[in-house]
């Protein structure tokens, strides 16, 4: 095992169009097989669709959607005396963002629209209105944490 200390997190550069690091992270998560150009077309195409359909600034819709998707609590399995408990824990800001983006894309990919940009746009608009699969995932996670509140004293 290496003993040279912790390696710092690599910082992503803000995207050229909206100057946002979160959009860059979204693009990087959309990307498959290193095809960043395709991922950018999907992301910016989705933002254009949002602008046409809602006549709002796409970044506002995106930020609202992300706030509605990102979880505050999650459960972590902890084994104590032969029993496994689901212990609710708070989610760190970095992980909140990562989970939000991941859930957004999983929900988008499962949708029925023909093109990914349409699916992503629809899921973002749904999430901004507090509906959709990604928001449901967050609600389920929060319900799970609420149901296991009794085990909160087993925190890490």
UniProtKB/Swiss-Prot annotation:
Keyword tRNA-binding tagged: yes
Disulfide bond positions: none
PROSITE patterns documented for this protein: RIBOSOMAL_S7
Single GO MF descriptor: tRNA binding
Any Gene Ontology CC annotation: small ribosomal subunit
InterPro entries (alphabetical): Ribosomal_uS7, Ribosomal_uS7_bac/org-type, Ribosomal_uS7_CS, Ribosomal_uS7_dom, Ribosomal_uS7_dom_sf
UniProt-listed Gene3D superfamilies: Ribosomal protein S7 domain
A single BP term in Gene Ontology: translation
UniProt xrefs under CDD domains: uS7_Bacteria
Classification via SUPFAM superfamilies: Ribosomal protein S7
Superkingdom of the source species: Bacteria
Keyword terms: Ribonucleoprotein, Ribosomal protein, RNA-binding, rRNA-binding, tRNA-binding
Record function comment: One of the primary rRNA binding proteins, it binds directly to 16S rRNA where it nucleates assembly of the head domain of the 30S subunit. Is located at the subunit interface close to the decoding center, probably blocks exit of the E-site tRNA.
Family the entry assigns: Belongs to the universal ribosomal protein uS7 family.
NCBIfam families in UniProt: rpsG_bact
Subunit organization: Part of the 30S ribosomal subunit. Contacts proteins S9 and S11.
Name the record gives this protein: Small ribosomal subunit protein uS7
């Amino acid at each position: 095992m290496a003993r040279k200390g912790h390696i710092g997190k690599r910082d992503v550069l803000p995207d050229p169009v909206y100057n946002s690091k979160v959009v860059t992270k979204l693009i990087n998560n959309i990307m498959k097989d290193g095809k960043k150009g395709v991922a950018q077309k999907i992301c910016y195409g989705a933002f254009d669709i949002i602008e046409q359909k809602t006549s709002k600034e796409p970044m506002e819709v995106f930020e609202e959607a992300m706030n509605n998707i990102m979880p505050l609590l999650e459960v972590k399995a902890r084994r104590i005396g032969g029993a496994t408990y689901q212990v609710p824990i708070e989610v760190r800001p970095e992980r909140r963002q990562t989970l939000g983006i991941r859930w957004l894309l999983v929900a988008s990919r499962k949708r029925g629209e023909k093109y990914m940009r349409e699916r992503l746009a629809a899921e973002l608009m749904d999430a901004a209105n507090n509906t959709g699969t990604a928001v449901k995932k967050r609600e389920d996670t929060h319900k799970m944490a609420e149901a296991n509140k009794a085990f909160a004293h087993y925190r890490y």
